[in-house]
Amino acid sequence: LSQNKHLIHLVKEMNNYIGPKSDPEGKGHKMICIDGNIYGLTHELDEYVDYWIIQSYGSSNPGFDGYGVDPKKIICTENFEKYATNGGQLLKQAAAMPREGYKGGVGAYRFDNDYDNTPNYKWMRQAIQINQRVFNEWKAKQNEAENKPQK
């Protein structure tokens, strides 16, 4: 993908209509998300993309570093075409945080397959709760650091 000049051109042109560059006043826009192997694309396209979706299939540590983008724009995902019955590594991905900052979120390919679990969407519900908890913990640490008296 990194050598795909046509894809890079397409995403930049799409930003005339959708994506972050289509909304210079910040009034709201339709998002552009790129899902897949994002290495090599992030440097040239980061300002044109709202979220990068990394396929962390089967990985308990999705790794947010090394892409050259702010981790808050990265959503890590598990493969529920394969792991819907046991959740795979989704809960560990939900708990994972980058070294600096926070992640954009967590998700799953074919999370509709989680519907048949008991309760419905068993793994996705837990992942959302875990993701929210670790974000709130991160935010509390940020607030604590900001309110700490300077010596």
Task: Kindly give the residue locations of the regions a language model identified.
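Secreted glycan hydrolases and related glycan-binding modules that recognize and/or cleave
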Residues: 1-151
